[in-house]
Swiss-Prot record:
In addition to polymerase activity, this DNA polymerase exhibits 5'-3' exonuclease activity. Residues 439-487 form the RPE1 insert domain. It comes from Rickettsia felis (strain ATCC VR-1525 / URRWXCal2). This is DNA polymerase I. NCBIfam families: pola (TIGR00593), PRK05755.1 (NF004397), RPE1 (TIGR01045).
Length: 922
């Protein structure tokens, strides 16, 4: 597609609008919307890569009125204003073009189309080629011998055949046809009832719009003739509006549009300012320049990585590290497999390839095939006088399983980034390295490398790599093959690790400038060690009980299926929404059948089934029960026994520290924070989580913690007083909402009040509350009004928080943690983002309170040399496994520490329960 002597004319705003609607919402490091800017920059880079033009220009509308508005004041009057989050980006689009060194063309009073037409015509007159980059149909009028139109959406040049197929005429007659058709998007009237087929037929017969009106008597259809006669003025105006002005008074100097690579420093600053890290590699390759990942990395040039392959070489590294006092270290893993240990000193990186590839949690130790390096590295990691800089600390802690608690003076760049900008789209520092490797593992290249081997080996190896492309797993490959295939990702990772020290210095400065250093050093970093310990300990699960429960669920599922088939009169795949919809709404002719927006199949979600149930259709109850049991069976009773470790005979979850916007922890593989609690079946599953013999489980659960936090941060006197007086807050709310005395309340009143109390925290709407309480929208709205009247200050807090989030792009919790709300300017998702903003300071404060409690409890347990161990964190709750002879000792310690983790205007209350399994303590 190379066009070395071609002028490329780019429809600027056409690109920007396409980019906005094609791109997921993105925000800059400052929380500003930049999705359209990112998409625009990405498109421009692609054009440079594809076309390699000698001359190029991005052409913009100047805005405001132009000559077409004088002809027809209603021109484009029907267009709605662009979305708010796009409006704030529009003034910056020229910066995108100029930072990529694109010449810009625009002129007051003219649209981009006219400027494109002018430059295209003048360039073509010189015998030079022109390519217009646009999806705008109006520009198809320009097509000619030296002028081509390239549609970036379709990724192809538009041909005359394409124009004829769509409009029924050639490009030179397009203006005539479109004048008759009109253009709704631009509010160009055209002639009523005349579409492309009729218009092209008339132009074929008469040659032009003018000729039609000069020969109206020759129009055979009386109806068409009358329509044309009545619309003559509109048609002639449309002809003027659609035509392009190719004589705009502009200084035409083709040499002024010659493109050259952008200034490296200028481009680096631009990409960093807007957070466009994913464009770094493309820009580097395209412009043959170096873009530093952070502004401060200019101290030393990163040199090619060196491999350390024996203890003597590593000992030399250790001596240098001791002398310098700081080094980088990163354990490169792909899907749990250890691939390489990467070290760095003063921007020089070193690679140690790891032969032990097992991803069994308990295979990591210092007595394996990696003996020659593990002890030397461990001595460095435990040396208090040497600072270690890593990224994603936990894999390194697991590598030194039993001794990980001895590791000291280590910093985690990932946790630093999170403390600075929780909620923003965080990209793994090594993401580009993984992308490079995934490109390297493309199918043709892979097969070529295995040329000469059996087809079976190539196929198996290719399959194993591609199935896990996002993580680059190579666990099924021979070692020599693994290191060969991983060479790209190892080398690219080494380049990044070489910059760890510089990154650390920059992050420390930013943390201190943003008052986030205490969050990182006092909460985020120490909790990482505790989570690692919890993951290694795991929790005991009764596999035999789960197997029995699975069989019990399975038997009921089979019975439900028989009843469903009997009621429907046929067998079908109940798990297929498409088949289920056809059975319910076509075969059985049940009401409420509604096709989903994105597919031709019927909606069969819980809302529809519950509605059918309310109207007495028994099959809906059976289906809801079937779904409940199959989900529990698949998610828990079938899968949990398979996740029990063969060595520890316990289940080991993984806690994620940086996956939420609020600082809240999450759990995966398996997710043990989501085990159901509100149903009898959910409680049966909790019964499977048991204490070891001679131990008890202790649950320590914060009581109504989020309401207590709300009362403090929003300064709600009525709420604070209720908590200080130890009143039942749900009972108090019920009395106010329903105008009843305490003795008149029922459990249903309290249940509704509880839903209102907690719903308000999440910014629930009247519609949402009505649905939850099964009341009318009017009733729900009245409940909310009464709530705001009783608890004065809550509504003000909500409005102030939304306004702060809108102005700053983030909210702040009690401890000063910034919780970014990147969608706050997204028109479609604004309400969702506002609800998130209201809740984030509360949920984020809760998350930090319980993390502080975990840290303090861990210290107390260590200090007293107790065998008590923390095994799970479930948001408001901590689960301990405690020796029976420590229960009486440790229970008051847990309660005291949890209730004194922070100072607020209201007491923090912890409820303690002791039992043999998780069900007993709930």
């Amino acid at each position: 597609m190379t066009q070395k002597n071609t002028l490329l004319l780019i429809d600027g705003y056409g690109f920007v609008f396409r980019a906005y609607y094609a791109q997921q919402p993105l925000t800059s490091p400052k929380g500003e919307p930049v999705g359209a800017l990112y998409g625009f920059a990405s498109m421009l880079l692609k054009l440079l890569s594809d076309f390699k033009p000698k001359h190029v220009a991005v052409v913009f509308d100047s805005g405001g009125k132009n000559f077409r508005h004088h002809i027809y004041p209603e021109y484009k009057a029907n267009r709605p204003p662009p979305p708010e989050d796009l409006v704030v980006q529009l003034p910056l689009v020229r910066d995108v073009a100029s930072n990529l060194n694109f010449p810009i063309l625009e002129k007051n009073g003219y649209e981009a189309d006219d400027i494109i037409a002018t430059f295209a015509a003048k360039t073509a007159a010189l015998g030079e080629d022109v390519v217009v980059i646009s999806s705008d149909k109006d520009l198809l009028q320009l097509m000619g011998e030296n002028i081509k139109i390239y549609d970036p959406l379709k990724g192809k040049y538009i041909t005359e055949d394409d124009v004829v197929k769509k409009f029924g005429t050639t490009s030179d007659k397009l203006r005539e046809v479109m004048a008759l058709i009109g253009d709704r998007s631009d509010n160009i009237p055209g002639v009523p009832s005349i579409g492309p087929k009729t218009a092209s037929s008339l132009i074929t017969q008469f040659g032009s719009v003018e000729n039609i009106f000069n020969s109206l008597e020759q129009v055979s259809s009386l109806k068409q003739r009358e329509t044309l006669q009545n619309s003559k003025e509109a048609a002639l105006i449309s002809w003027q509006l659609i035509g392009l002005d190719s004589n705009v008074d502009l200084d035409f100097q083709l040499n002024n549009l010659e493109w050259s690579p952008p200034n490296s420093d200028k481009l680096t600053g631009f990409l960093q300012e807007y957070g466009f890290k994913s464009l770094y590699k493309r820009a580097e390759n395209l412009f043959d320049i170096k873009i530093n990942d952070h502004k401060e990395i200019v101290e030393n040039k990163v040199t090619e990585a060196k491999e350390i392959s024996n203890a003597s070489e590593l000992a030399d590294f250790a001596k240098k590290a001791e002398k310098i006092g700081i080094f980088g270290i990163y354990l490169l893993q792909h899907k749990g497999d250890n691939v390489a240990l990467i070290l760095s000193l003063q921007n020089q990186s070193y690679i140690i390839k790891i032969s032990n590839t097992s991803h069994d949690l308990f295979s990591y130790n210092t007595k394996n095939n990696n003996d020659w390096f593990s002890d030397i590295i461990f001595n460095l990691l435990t040396d208090k006088s040497i600072r270690k800089i890593t990224y994603s600390l936990k894999p390194l802690l697991k590598f030194y399983a039993e001794q990980s608690h001895e590791i000291t003076a280590i910093e985690d760049l990932e946790l630093m980034q999170y403390a600075l900008s929780a909620g923003l789209s965080q990209k793994n520092l090594f993401e580009e390295a993984l992308k490079e490797d995934n490109r390297h593992l493309s199918k043709p290249a892979y097969r070529e490398e295995f040329k000469g081997d059996t087809e079976a080996l190539a196929t198996a190896a290719y399959k194993s790599v591609r199935e896990d492309a996002s993580t680059g797993s190579t666990s099924k490959l021979p070692l020599e093959t693994k290191f060969g295939k991983m060479s790209n990702v190892i080398n690219e990772s080494a380049r990044i690790v070489a910059e760890f020290t510089s990154l650390y210095k920059q992050n420390i400065l930013e943390l201190k400038d943003n008052k986030a250093f205490r969050l990182y050093s006092n909460i985020d970093l120490p909790i990482c060690f505790i989570l690692d310990k919890m993951e290694k300990i795991g929790i005991k699960v009764d596999a035999n009980y789960l197997n029995q429960l699975s069989a019990e669920f399975g038997a009921e599922i089979l019975k439900l299926e028989e009843e469903i088939f009997a009621l429907s009169g046929t067998k079908f795949n109940i798990g297929s929404p498409k088949q289920l919809g056809e059975i319910l709404f076509e075969k059985m002719q049940l009401p409420f059948g509604k096709a989903s927006a994105k597919a031709s199949s019927y909606s069969t979600g819980a809302e529809i089934l519950e509605k059918l149930s309310e109207h007495g259709y028994n099959i809906a109850d059976l289906l809801l029960r079937w779904r409940q049991l199959t989900k529990l069976k698949n998610t828990y009773t079938d899968s949990l026994p398979k996740q029990i470790d063969n060595i520890t005979h316990r289940v080991h979850t993984t806690f994620l520290q940086t996956s939420t916007t609020t600082g809240r922890l999450s759990s995966q593989e398996p997710n043990l924070q989501n085990v159901p609690i509100r149903s009898s079946e959910g409680n049966k599953i909790r019964q499977a989580f048991i204490a070891e013999e001679g131990y008890k489980l202790i649950s320590a659960d914060y009581s109504q913690i989020e309401l207590r936090i709300l009362s403090h941060i929003a300064n709600i006197d009525a709420l604070k007083q209720a908590f200080i007086n130890k009143d039942d807050i749900h009972t108090q709310t019920a009395c106010q909402i329903f105008n009843l005395q305490k003795h008149e309340l029922t459990s249903e009143h309290r249940r509704k009040a509880k839903a209102i109390n907690f719903g308000i925290i999440y910014g629930i709407s009247a519609f949402g509350l009505a649905k939850q309480l099964n009341v009318s929208n009017g009733e729900a709205s009245e409940y909310i009004k009464k709530y705001f009247a009783e608890y004065k200050g809550v509504q003000e807090y909500m409005e102030q928080t939304k306004a702060f989030a809108s102005s700053n792009g983030y909210v702040i919790n009690f401890f000063g943690r910034k919780c970014f709300v990147p969608l706050i300017h997204d028109k479609k998702l604004k309400q969702f983002a506002e609800r998130a903003a209201i809740n984030a300071p509360i949920q984020g404060t809760n998350a930090d309170i319980i993390k502080i409690a975990m840290i303090n409890l861990d210290q107390e347990i260590e200090k007293n040399n107790l065998k008590t161990r923390l095994v799970l964190q479930i948001h408001d709750e901590l689960l301990f496994e405690v020796p029976e002879d420590e229960v009486e000792l440790v229970t008051p310690i847990i309660k005291k520490i949890m209730e004194n983790s922070t100072n607020m205007d209201v007491p923090i209350i912890t409820e303690i329960r002791v039992g043999n399994n998780w069900m007993e303590i709930h």
